[in-house]
Amino acid sequence: MSKTVKVAVTGAAGQIGYSLLFRIASGQMFGADTAVEIQMLELEAAIPAAKGVIMELEDCAFPLLQKVTVSSDLDTAFKEINWALLVGSVPRKAGMERGDLLKINGGIFVNQGKAIEKNAASDVRILVVGNPCNTNCLIAMNNAKGISQDRWFAMTKLDENRAKSQLASKAGVPVKEVTHLGIWGNHSATQYPDFYNTKISGKPVTDVISDHEWLKGDFIKNVQQRGAEIIKARGASSAASAANGVVDTVRGIITPTAPGDCFSAAVVSDGSYGAEKGLIFGFPLKSDGKKVEIIQGISLNDFAKEKFKITHEELVSERNEVKEML
């Protein structure tokens, strides 16, 4: 066993947390040669439930799981961590305006950013999952200015996986045949799943799927609205698929990307493709296993540019609503 990774998981007793913790402990996130210590952060009221999850983790006797703890104290939960998986956030309730949600969650992520900066290991990386994840990530990052901006990520991999599944189903091929699929912008109903640059079995999607109206219409809408569809169907938001997106994102960051392929996450914009510098914006990315880069030179046609503009405007608007927290 080569090393031990300390991972903080916030909102650990929630649905996504429950699906995620066992996958971390089993080695699916960091690999079969990496031991893990899990430090759960939960609200005081949820500590008993979290302790029940700890009992279950213990009962799995995972060889890689060295230690698991739970705390409601930020300093304790983030002590010397190498990874922070910020899953917990306040969900939008009936009658709640989006601006209210941004501000309520903003306060949470201000404090978490400060606590991570104060307590985490020098090599910490942070993945924000709790929605609205792009702007929550922006807030936390701006309250932890001592941590390099290239260590902050927000999750769009679930959207990428949803898009791949839709395209594979339409083309009648296994999902592994779908590659080069990037998600641009916000993890919201404005995101743009970039089918024009996606490949199916190495060929452009537009050559394989002849129904271009479906691609430009229902395909994008299906990906954008998938979360709402799942809530309608099961009476709760997607949890196992979101947890899978977290695992896939971390794997994408720490594993070299296959030549010519990409993976999706939101990172701090350096101005690439005209996305405003400093925004947390979804891009197609590549990794060498250590450093993550925005893939350059991707061609965006007029259709794509229009979609890009819509999601970019939404992220600028969200940023402006929480300016006093940055």
From Swiss-Prot:
Any Pfam family: Ldh_1_N
Catalytic reaction list: (S)-malate + NAD(+) = oxaloacetate + NADH + H(+)
Entry binding sites for NAD(+): G11, A12, A13, G14, Q15, I16, G17, N105, Q112, V129, G130, N131
Domain of life where this protein originates: Bacteria
GO biological process, one term: oxaloacetate metabolic process
Enzyme's top EC category: oxidoreductase
Residues annotated as binding substrate: R92, R98, N131, R162
Record-level Gene Ontology MF annotations: L-malate dehydrogenase (NAD+) activity
EC annotation from Swiss-Prot or TrEMBL: 1.1.1.37
Keyword line: NAD, Oxidoreductase, Tricarboxylic acid cycle
Residue numbers annotated as active site: H187
Homology family: Belongs to the LDH/MDH superfamily. MDH type 2 family.
Summary of the function given for this chain in its UniProt record: Catalyzes the reversible oxidation of malate to oxaloacetate.
Official protein name in the record: Malate dehydrogenase
Organism: Leptospira interrogans serogroup Icterohaemorrhagiae serovar Lai (strain 56601)
